[in-house]
Regions:
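Small-residue-biased structural context
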Residues: 1-239
Length: 239
């Protein structure tokens, strides 16, 4: 089977195909990871925020739309998708840990290196194995339909790490609205805070912390953990 990285949009079912959309996001991620190299301080935080806002909605839409299809369509679909769900879980846990570390903490470097490594592993697994398998058992029309569903969910999905939430429906789907609202309010507050100074910036950063704490409380609602595999379960102690 040919990796989707080596196929054209036409071969992937057209630009609206879920495979073409995935490939475009992966290209964007690769560029951001290259930009991340050698950054420090506020510049590193800005690049990381762009990575988070790309990666987390992307993964949420995969877990809600694509992986259930693969589990139904492929005899080994459960094992294939579970491996990627475990990678997604590790990304959530690494980002949560990274956000708690001070910029000059010696642990930050190794955590960041591992995050980049897992993100690249995830892309390779999807492009070289999962998506060619999906392509082999799915019509072009279905790939396009999945692309529309995936894009809709991606646009309303949470934008931050939530390691306690299930990586599978229905828990992750139930979590989408409350966590997305909190995450996007936090994104907006932090974006303005970075352009502000003095009392205004302090108030906005305080608002961001309140929104973060609220999201962590929402994560622990039992309904949001329904459907999860035990191997991707988090106690939330790092949050």
């Amino acid at each position: 089977m040919t990796s989707i990285a080596e196929q054209t949009d036409a071969e992937l079912g057209g630009r609206v195909s879920v495979l073409a959309r995935q490939k475009r996001d992966h290209v964007k991620l690769d560029r951001l990871l290259q930009q991340l190299e050698g950054t420090h301080g506020q510049e590193q935080e800005r690049v990381l925020l762009r990575i988070y806002r790309l990666v987390f909605p992307h993964a949420f839409a995969e877990e809600s739309v694509l992986w259930p299809v693969m589990r139904r369509a492929l005899p080994d679909g459960h094992a294939l998708t579970l491996e990627v769900e475990q990678e997604h879980q590790e990304v959530n846990e690494l980002v949560t840990r990274l956000e708690r570390l001070d910029p000059d903490d010696p642990e930050r470097g190794p955590v960041l290196e591992r995050l980049v490594e897992v993100l690249r592993e995830d892309v390779r697994d999807e492009e070289d194995e999962l998506f060619p398998r999906l392509q082999a058992v799915t019509t072009t029309a279905e790939l396009r339909r999945l692309g529309v569903y995936w894009e809709v969910l991606r646009r309303i999905a949470p934008t931050r790490a939530h390691p306690v939430v299930a990586r599978r429906p229905p828990g992750n789907v139930i979590s989408a609205l409350p966590l997305s609202v909190l995450d996007r309010l936090r994104d907006a507050a932090e974006a303005v805070a970075r352009r502000s100074s003095g009392d205004v910036a302090d108030r906005l950063w305080a608002a961001s912390r309140v929104l973060t704490a609220a999201a962590h409380r929402v994560e622990r609602f039992p309904l949001l953990r329904i459907g999860e595999d035990p191997s991707t379960r988090s106690t939330g102690s790092a949050a």
